[in-house]
Amino acid sequence: MPHSDELDSRDVLSVSGLNIAFHHEGQQVDAVRNVSLRLKRGETLAIVGESGSGKSVTALALMRLIEQSGANVRCGEMLLRRRNRQVIELSEQSDAQMRRVRGADIAMIFQEPMTSLNPVFTVGEQIAESIRLHQRASHEEALAEAKRMLDQVRIPESQAILSRYPHQLSGGMRQRVMIAMALSCRPAVLIADEPTTALDVTIQAQILQLIKVLQQEMSMGVIFITHDMGVVADIADRVLVMYQGEAVETGSVEQIFHAPTHPYTQTLLAAVPQLGAMRGHSLPRRFPLISADEPALYESQIEQDTVVEGEPILQVRGLVTRFPLRSGLFNRVTREVHAVENISFDLWPGETLSLVGESGSGKSTTGRALLRLVESRQGEIIFNGQRIDTLSAGKLQPLRRDIQCIFQDPYASLDPRQTVGYSIMEPLRIHGLGQGDAAAKRVAWLLERVGLRPEHAWRYPHEFSGGQRQRICIARALALNPKVIIADEAVSALDVSVRGQIINLLLDLQREMGIAYLFISHDMAVVERISHRVAVMYLGQIVEMGPRRAVFENPQHPYTRKLMAAVPVADPSRHRPRRVLLSDDIPSNIHKRGEETPAVSLQLVGPGHYVARPLQDNALSRL
């Protein structure tokens, strides 16, 4: 049925009176109430709000995917203008018709790429499949286009990446693959649900620039769902603010940032972490929080040095981790990924050492090597005076109580067949630390400490938002009262208020229990807030390391300065300068087998502040 008269000539999407409800334990739970929005060609509409506010549910409803979760969707209208200019009512389309519409006319980039990519197919096959389906291209043409899209999202060694599987890529690279797949068919509307959450600041800036360039070329409408107000200021034309399932304020990006009218919008903006806010402070400080009852900011700024002098609890010496790449007729190892190259550092009790760097720089691999989830090629890992890199699995088991981890992808970390209460209780049972009522009380306490309710223990992972799932993973990591927690992008999926709550919780636990954190993150504003010391990684090596104040207030290495410059600012009047993205600007840590990476030499430039000699590298020479 044509609906062209009901849609303005410049609009590509119009939604009015959207209501979404779920049935839980015999009761109806309203997730979205009476939300309306319009999107014009070439326009970017940002939908912002806290975790659980209904942002992602709204996006899934537009894709007609939410019904598969048992949702009840009621809507006045949901009109889409396809690439061929035909206007259709999305709610009237059959499943077969929607399969033709998805990808070709309306595409979506999901928040968690590992759950969106098929683990049994290569990256190239998955991108090519979408191109073959919607553009009727041959297999060879589709693979060539897939490589071109990987080049556009700046994945190094794109030809080699085509034949790799999702689990062989870092979280940031998987997200770039998702973006390439969504843009491959040049849809009329692109829905981006936290598309840069897993990306470091430099790649994030480049991806945002890429989306804007492609948007201008194709007159594509973009719905950008995010909790990062700096990204909103950088990319959005208009903003829709959601709170508890309702649209509480909408307007141009200038109106929302410079003259917000709703109290929730005002407090949301005030809670945004700003790079440079820690200038003059040497110790970590708590984030200001949003009170749910009264939208005002409050914080405790009592600075306390939690670092315990004496012997480090964790020592890393000359750590090297490499991964083989096979090719050829006989599937021999011909090249290697030099993920971590000769890095050394110490971690003291009660200290937070942050590892920062681009996706693929070796941050996460370092954390996994310390946990013995991947085996290192050489080097020493010493925990509490005991070398652990040579221990057998049986002897390593008791030590796992003292070293816990929080991974980047919460959905992949939780068993979808078990309640979250069982997942949190499982470590207690494995290590014989609690049974029955005692374990249940511990689970209830942990859920409350991370901002959830005790009754949530009976729910399953799919019933929570991405941010809530990450809080569950943090609760599980805290269950055993560890001495060291390796937090791999632990707060990257959380909105600003929940992120602040979790960081404050980590700081409180550090103060109470003396926990040491190895904090792996690409969020420089969060790193500045939580860290005692910072180590900057580039292509598997540490190029700058020192006290947080020294590194942030006086960065010495050009790569560190590049990371600082790429941080988005929550002010639409202060745009980053754009630069041309060059193909040879893509760093790569893939080398021929037997080829050694030149080791960087760290020089002391201040108290505890070490900087590598400038790298002779094409990418860094232009910084």
UniProtKB/Swiss-Prot annotation:
<comment type="similarity">
    <text>Belongs to the ABC transporter superfamily. Glutathione importer (TC 3.A.1.5.11) family.</text>
</comment>
<dbReference type="InterPro" id="IPR003439">
    <property type="entry name" value="ABC_transporter-like_ATP-bd"/>
</dbReference>
<dbReference type="InterPro" id="IPR027417">
    <property type="entry name" value="P-loop_NTPase"/>
</dbReference>
<keyword id="KW-0997">Cell inner membrane</keyword>
<keyword id="KW-0067">ATP-binding</keyword>
<feature type="binding site">
    <location>
        <begin position="49"/>
        <end position="56"/>
    </location>
    <ligand>
        <name>ATP</name>
    </ligand>
</feature>
<feature type="binding site">
    <location>
        <begin position="357"/>
        <end position="364"/>
    </location>
    <ligand>
        <name>ATP</name>
    </ligand>
</feature>
<comment type="function">
    <text>Part of the ABC transporter complex GsiABCD involved in glutathione import. Responsible for energy coupling to the transport system.</text>
</comment>
<comment type="subunit">
    <text>The complex is composed of two ATP-binding proteins (GsiA), two transmembrane proteins (GsiC and GsiD) and a solute-binding protein (GsiB).</text>
</comment>
<keyword id="KW-1003">Cell membrane</keyword>
<feature type="domain" description="ABC transporter 2">
    <location>
        <begin position="325"/>
        <end position="564"/>
    </location>
</feature>
<dbReference type="InterPro" id="IPR003593">
    <property type="entry name" value="AAA+_ATPase"/>
</dbReference>
<dbReference type="InterPro" id="IPR013563">
    <property type="entry name" value="Oligopep_ABC_C"/>
</dbReference>
<dbReference type="GO" id="GO:0055085">
    <property type="term" value="P:transmembrane transport"/>
</dbReference>
<dbReference type="GO" id="GO:0005886">
    <property type="term" value="C:plasma membrane"/>
</dbReference>
<keyword id="KW-1278">Translocase</keyword>
<keyword id="KW-0547">Nucleotide-binding</keyword>
<keyword id="KW-0472">Membrane</keyword>
<keyword id="KW-0677">Repeat</keyword>
<feature type="domain" description="ABC transporter 1">
    <location>
        <begin position="15"/>
        <end position="269"/>
    </location>
</feature>
<keyword id="KW-0378">Hydrolase</keyword>
<dbReference type="InterPro" id="IPR050319">
    <property type="entry name" value="ABC_transp_ATP-bind"/>
</dbReference>
<dbReference type="GO" id="GO:0005524">
    <property type="term" value="F:ATP binding"/>
</dbReference>
<dbReference type="GO" id="GO:0016887">
    <property type="term" value="F:ATP hydrolysis activity"/>
</dbReference>
<dbReference type="Pfam" id="PF00005">
    <property type="entry name" value="ABC_tran"/>
</dbReference>
<keyword id="KW-0813">Transport</keyword>
<dbReference type="Pfam" id="PF08352">
    <property type="entry name" value="oligo_HPY"/>
</dbReference>
<dbReference type="GO" id="GO:0015833">
    <property type="term" value="P:peptide transport"/>
</dbReference>
<protein>
    <recommendedName>
        <fullName>Glutathione import ATP-binding protein GsiA</fullName>
        <ecNumber>7.4.2.10</ecNumber>
    </recommendedName>
</protein>
<dbReference type="InterPro" id="IPR017871">
    <property type="entry name" value="ABC_transporter-like_CS"/>
</dbReference>
